[in-house]
């Protein structure tokens, strides 16, 4: 017998601009979005994963841009409880994300008991992955997939440098590059070396102990990288502007894009310097290898292919820590330390693992 779907639910709602403790409110009467269109499903959320871009947008965007109030976050896992789709049925255990167009349309994010989601943004959760593990696979996983498998098309024997190997995108990028036969060098702080090597990195660089562009020049100028993956965000433009010394001109510098925390003067200046370097012609000192930004878009075919790596065990989910639903603010505190190794997950349904 099907469980009745309630009219209201508990949810963490972004109600104001600021840090998560000021921006979010726990509501117990947020409406459940039930009016499904064709190709949509209603998911009973089991777990939701946090993304750094979420709390950064809390701080940066004014209300009229952010569309507040709105339930926070994008990544989730759960069970389909209502369906207007031919592929996904009631009772299917799924994971995926809420794309930005649906987010704006419904004001419904992942940090709630129920979420209305386009069916093509979800795939069936493999049996070898728990709901908590699955919650954090999509946004960062598909970003890494786009970088390694579509933009770079990394092949066997190629050399890849991942800046930020302990970030979720970086850890997925390392694994995907190794699956495709590449040699991977990755950076992180010393405390994360074992984690980065566990992901598959062949060599490790402690970025806190060296001038990174200088170190890469000294060690890799005669064996240049085919691709550089900037998984941190544009924190140091010199990694690109000095990359002719260690990046093949036939390769590319591929970034997750700017990740400002508060639009400080230094952050804006770094973005400006990188933007200028991106468009400067080679004839007047521009870099030989192109700079490419990757922004993930909803693509079911990509999600299915990425899922295949998860299902066969060649790609590991990356969970740093797990918090109960009412402790979501503590989860954000963990994320904001910058010390998380992989995904910070909020368990919405206390009965799942």
What are the functions of these language-model segments?
Residues 137-210:
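Mid-domain Rossmann-like dinucleotide-binding core that forms the NAD(H)/NADP(H) cofactor-binding site
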């Amino acid at each position: 017998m099907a469980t009745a779907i309630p009219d209201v639910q508990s949810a963490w709602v972004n109600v104001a601009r600021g840090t998560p403790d000021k921006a979010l409110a726990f509501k117990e009467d947020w409406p459940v979005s039930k009016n499904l269109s064709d190709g949509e499903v209603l998911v009973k959320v089991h777990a939701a994963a946090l993304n750094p871009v979420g709390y950064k947008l809390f701080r940066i965007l004014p209300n009229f841009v952010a569309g507040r109030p709105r339930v926070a976050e994008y990544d989730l896992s759960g069970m389909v409880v209502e369906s207007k789709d031919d592929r996904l049925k009631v009772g299917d255990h799924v994971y995926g994300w809420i794309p930005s167009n649906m987010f704006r349309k419904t004001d419904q994010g992942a940090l709630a008991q129920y979420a209305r989601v386009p069916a093509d943004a979800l795939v069936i959760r493999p049996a070898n992955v728990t709901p908590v593990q699955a919650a954090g696979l999509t946004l960062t996983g598909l970003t890494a997939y786009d970088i390694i498998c579509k933009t770079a098309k990394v092949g066997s024997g190629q050399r890849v440098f991942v800046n930020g190997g302990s970030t979720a995108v970086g850890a997925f990028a390392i694994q995907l590059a190794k699956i495709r036969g590449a040699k991977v060098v990755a950076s992180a702080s010393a405390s994360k070396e074992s984690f980065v090597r566990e992901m598959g990195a062949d060599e490790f660089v402690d970025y806190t102990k060296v001038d990174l562009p200088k170190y890469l020049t000294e060690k890799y100028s005669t064996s240049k990288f085919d691709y550089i993956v900037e998984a941190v965000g544009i924190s140091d433009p010199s990694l690109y502007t000095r990359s002719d010394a260690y990046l093949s001109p036939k390769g590319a510098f591929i970034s997750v894009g700017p990740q400002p925390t508060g639009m400080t003067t230094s952050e804006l200046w770094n973005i400006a310097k990188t933007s200028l370097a991106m468009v400067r012609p080679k004839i007047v000192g521009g870099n030989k290898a192109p700079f490419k930004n990757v922004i993930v878009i909803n693509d079911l075919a990509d999600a299915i292919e990425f899922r295949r790596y998860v299902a066969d065990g060649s790609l590991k989910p990356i969970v740093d820590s797990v918090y109960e639903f009412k402790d979501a603010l503590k989860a954000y505190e963990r994320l904001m330390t910058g010390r998380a190794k992989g995904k910070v997950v909020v368990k919405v349904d206390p009965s799942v693992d």
